[in-house]
């Protein structure tokens, strides 16, 4: 068997790895980078650009530069997640004839697998250039919480790229493989927290090592397939748009070119704030009106960024708690925490994860490369080059059929180890019923309509009989890729109907084949600057904390008491935009003094609720010399997030 490469097909970046002897190696692309932006552009001269070259020209070609396609793959156009993205993407998202979400570039409608295939082709070529031989086999990773439709669509993308997809494996599982192969001692329970560009997964995985044999068993998985770095970027972009609108009276959302520049600058600012306390978004000539060109120059502090995205980070807590519950484990049972995905570099994310688990996550796992490395290891297992490794993954969602009364009856429960096969006997609902419709569903709701419809088929030719007499055996066979095969058999006549679930939509084999064919053809100054940034950070934190308190206990104050607070807030927000540290500090103190009645109201409310300790903490958060950012986080610590 030829080499089987491992590909991490990411929302923001992709990565390819291969076994080099018995060690996995991440392969650099033609530009010398170990990861490739998952960006595809279609130019005026008919050229298709992938990766960094596509990213570089995005500002001048926003409508034909496609990114974050993974958020659309295997989704219906009417899905709320898709409708949300339509308003923020510079390119067109359209509905296909079969109801799927497609994209449009250069006037041509394209299926997401067709677009993703361009990234996979670059990964394939990268591997071939390194190995000096043709590569046809691949293990491709997907978010653990991808449903059947999304997994099928990913396999389709592989086929279109000219790859035989040997296995689809879950990203957290792949990361655990990369982490666990060099851990030689005993047993370990790890939590893989995977926050990437477009998706979030949490998996609890038990790694057993006995006499050199490794078993990786997924105990539970959970997540959100529409939560990731792109959402963090969008919060930054929206903030910049609103600030510019307040300053200049111009809405940049109507200008695709400006929005593309903002996207690039917003992402860069977010990344910079992981290692610095302040950055400035400076975009000259962002737009123009009758008075002439307009320039965008907005300072962004880490405290402000964190206030913008705090709820997103919290949103990962519930899946985390659910995964622990499903695995019958407590936080104390987790030996190690692995962070995967570029967004986990954000200090706020690391803070929440550390507080939740009560321990620091590991720092020896590369969040950008671990998934591809794990996929390459699995490729080695499949090709026979890696021995003594057993991978036991699970299905993320329950699978079942619709039964009488619109109820979903599950045949395969969530977190069942795959592959698996389950059968159950059903009967007719009416007398002399000659046919039954098998409606296949995926999800956790008892009401059928609350779940994802994967498809349906009919079993006909049932002999006339009273209701409840015929015996129809329905079998669900879930393969190692997490893809479902369903059969229904009449035990009386022996008649049987089988299908491989292709979702109620998706690409037909003919469409995939056509796409396959198409794809072929200086010290003081520094000290002063640091002090200025510190003052800005403190001011931003104070503004955020005060506004939060106004929302929570503002009703307890009269309009006369609120007015000076709002006035002080406005004055401080204006001062923060300037370069005068003394002015910022003075306005911060004025806000603290103006907010005294607000603090008293908050203390009174907490005391009434029996929260003396909380009231003490709340009072301390208004002190000028406190680290305002920390105090702000202490306020929400009970809710903490991931």
Swiss-Prot record:
CDD domains: ASKHA_NBD_HSP70_DnaK-like (cd10234)
Family: Belongs to the heat shock protein 70 family.
Superkingdom of origin organism: Bacteria
UniProt-listed SUPFAM superfamilies: Actin-like ATPase domain, Heat shock protein 70kD (HSP70), C-terminal subdomain, Heat shock protein 70kD (HSP70), peptide-binding domain
Induction or repression: By stress conditions e.g. heat shock.
HAMAP family reported in the protein's UniProt record: DnaK
Pfam families: HSP70 (PF00012)
InterPro entries: ATPase_NBD, Chaperone_DnaK, Heat_shock_70_CS, HSP70_C_sf, HSP70_peptide-bd_sf, Hsp_70_fam
Region of interest (Disordered), ranges: 605-642
Biased composition (Low complexity): 605-624
Modified residues (Phosphothreonine): 199
Bias type Acidic residues, positions: 627-642
Gene coding for it: dnaK
Keywords in alphabetical order: ATP-binding, Chaperone, Nucleotide-binding, Phosphoprotein, Stress response
Molecular-function GO term, any one: ATP binding
Main function: Acts as a chaperone.
Protein name stated in the entry: Chaperone protein DnaK
